[in-house]
């Protein structure tokens, strides 16, 4: 059984994927471009990948392929319809980051509310050493307790964020779907959440309905100075509109772990703005990546492969 891992650097080097127990030939590459995919995977029975694009055109040229094992939850890099037509199974992994993503969100909440990035940036330039007083007050500090958190997406991650936030004394509102005709128990109408929330955190699935969920219209409904957190999917926000809202003060700050294009272009407006705006925090899509989460992920990837091969051998 030939197994090809096309983008091994999507997993930290100190936590390798356990090798399957059945006889196999394992080949891995740190990165694989679109142009390299077919040549590298032409003899593969199993492909392991996180983000390498496997289009219909590519899959049609991989006649030996039986399984695509995704080292993530999202499968948008694979043409699922083509895979099904060609008899190629696709297995992803869910639930591995149910602790680390909510913790990352809480860290972002504290960082924004206490202006931690601004204070740290000042120490790099030596500002405190030049102060006439034992402290100075250049950035706002507001309490997390008593703040209202608007959660968009009430799956396992959004629910856990809400649970932890309530333990901190925050008022948590779960947003109903935009344009919903009725409001379910345990939810608050979409526009009301925008109006009431001091902090917005995005955990919804990316669909045509949720794409650009945070746009000029929705931001205009928010409290002036509200904070935005996105650890969901980059396209949930309109990036230029968020930049404009930060510059105008409509948003008091933002903490983003995901962008529309990853890795981003050097001239990405948010990346450029973060160089000069201390209340804009960007992390490189690592909210999921605690050691325990990655360990769970790698074990589940191997288990997916083991289960598939076992089923294959039983046919």
Where are these regions (language model features)?
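N-terminal glycine-/charge-rich "phosphate-binding" loop or analogous flexible N-terminal tail
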Residues: 1-44
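Short beta->alpha connector loops at strand-helix junctions that form conserved
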Residues: 30, 71-72, 88-99, 176, ...
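Rossmann-like adenosine-cofactor binding region
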Residues: 54-59, 178-269
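Phosphate-binding beta-alpha-beta segment of Rossmann-like dinucleotide-binding domains, i.e.
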Residues: 86, 94-148
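Glycine-rich Rossmann-fold phosphate-binding loop(s) that bind the pyrophosphate
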Residues: 154-155
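N-terminal Rossmann-fold NAD(P) dinucleotide-binding loop
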Residues: 158-159
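Rossmann-like dinucleotide-binding domain for NAD(H)/NADP(H)
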Residues: 231-315
């Amino acid at each position: 059984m030939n197994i090809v891992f096309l983008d091994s650097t999507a997993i930290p080097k100190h936590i390798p994927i356990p090798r399957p127990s059945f006889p196999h030939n394992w080949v891995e590459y740190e990165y694989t471009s679109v142009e390299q995919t077919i040549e590298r995977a032409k003899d593969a029975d199993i492909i392991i990948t996180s983000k390498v694009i496997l289009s219909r055109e590519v899959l049609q040229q991989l006649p030996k392929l039986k399984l695509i094992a995704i080292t993530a939850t999202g499968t948008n890099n694979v043409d699922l319809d083509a895979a099904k037509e060609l008899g190629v199974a696709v297995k992803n992994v869910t639930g591995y980051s149910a602790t680390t993503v909510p913790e990352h969100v809480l860290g972002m909440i504290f960082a924004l509310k206490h202006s931690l990035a601004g204070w740290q940036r000042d120490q790099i330039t030596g500002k405190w050493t030049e102060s006439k007083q034992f402290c100075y007050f250049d950035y706002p500090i507001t309490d997390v307790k008593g703040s209202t958190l608007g959660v968009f997406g009430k799956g396992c991650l959004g629910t856990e964020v809400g649970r932890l936030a309530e333990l901190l004394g925050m008022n948590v509102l779960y947003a109903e779907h935009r344009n919903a005709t009725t409001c379910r128990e345990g939810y608050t109408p979409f526009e009301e959440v925008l109006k009431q929330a001091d902090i917005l955190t995005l955990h919804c699935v990316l669909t045509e309905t949720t794409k650009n969920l945070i746009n000029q219209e929705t931001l205009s409904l928010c409290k002036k100075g509200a904070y935005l957190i996105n650890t969901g999917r980059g396209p949930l926000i309109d990036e230029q509109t968020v930049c404009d809202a930060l510059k105008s003060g409509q948003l008091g700050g933002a903490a983003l772990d995901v962008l529309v294009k990853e890795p981003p272009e050097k001239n990405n407006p948010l990346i450029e703005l973060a160089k000069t705006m201390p209340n804009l925090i960007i992390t490189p899509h690592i909210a999921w990546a605690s050691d325990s989460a990655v360990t769970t992920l790698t074990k589940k990837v191997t288990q997916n492969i083991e289960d598939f091969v076992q089923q294959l051998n039983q046919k």
